[in-house]
């Protein structure tokens, strides 16, 4: 846990409240290099497509830039609501497509996003890595600090085969970046623990730092990346 478990003052009429149709996503601010700071949570910048997952009344809808019907491109994720121990939730995360060996594959992802499937079927196995929780039990959490939202996310989303919560560390940005470079990941995500979620530029709330992987570039499995082994 990052901090104390989030306790939500849920209103009695929360079951009748509906999730918003769309949410303006927060965008990361670019910085020059990885850094250390006890006020930040560091994790991989996942090589995939940004996606919001809306879970309501046992149904799933997704918001992905450029896709009018994301579920049609990622039908294997239809059962995501069964994994979320929450009703009226919105998750912020990244869509990946894995090859036969379980490695994130940019070309397989591109084909899905372009709708280049055969009779609605696509090669590769999709996965969704959740990084933030914007709504829970029909209540908006965007004014809560990231540390509380992340703790709540870990509590309501147990690990599964296709949908998982990524691993990260507080303070040790340069160490995490070194580990990610060895895994072929070219970006580091840094989220300020005390920051609210706001649409548009994240400024100090969410930063992205570049990482330079070695050549030839490694292509590890998602399972190995999730373990995030630190030297």
Role assignments for model-derived ranges:
Residues 1-231:
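Catalytic cores of nucleic-acid ligases and guanylyltransferases
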């Amino acid at each position: 846990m990052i901090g104390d478990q989030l306790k939500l003052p849920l209103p009695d009429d929360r079951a009748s409240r509906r999730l918003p149709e769309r949410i303006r996503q927060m965008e990361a601010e670019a910085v020059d290099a990885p850094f250390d700071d006890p006020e930040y949570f560091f994790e991989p910048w996942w090589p995939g497509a940004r996606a919001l997952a809306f879970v309501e009344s046992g149904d799933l809808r997704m918001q992905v830039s450029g896709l009018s019907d994301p579920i049609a491109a990622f039908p294997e994720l239809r059962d995501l609501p069964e994994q979320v121990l929450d009703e009226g939730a919105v998750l912020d995360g990244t869509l990946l497509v894995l090859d036969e060996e379980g490695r994130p594959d940019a070309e397989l992802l591109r084909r899905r996003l372009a709708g280049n499937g055969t009779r609605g079927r696509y090669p590769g196995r999709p996965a969704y890595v959740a990084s933030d929780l914007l709504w829970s039990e029909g209540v908006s959490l965007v004014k809560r600090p990231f540390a509380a939202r992340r703790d709540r996310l870990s509590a309501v989303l147990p690990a599964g085969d296709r949908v998982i919560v990524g691993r990260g560390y507080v303070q040790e940005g340069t160490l995490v970046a070194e580990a990610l470079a060895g895994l072929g990941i070219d970006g580091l995500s840094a989220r300020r623990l005390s920051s609210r979620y706001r649409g548009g530029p994240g400024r100090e709330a969410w930063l992205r730092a570049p990482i330079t992987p070695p050549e030839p570039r490694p292509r590890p499995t998602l399972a190995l990346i999730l373990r995030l082994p630190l030297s």
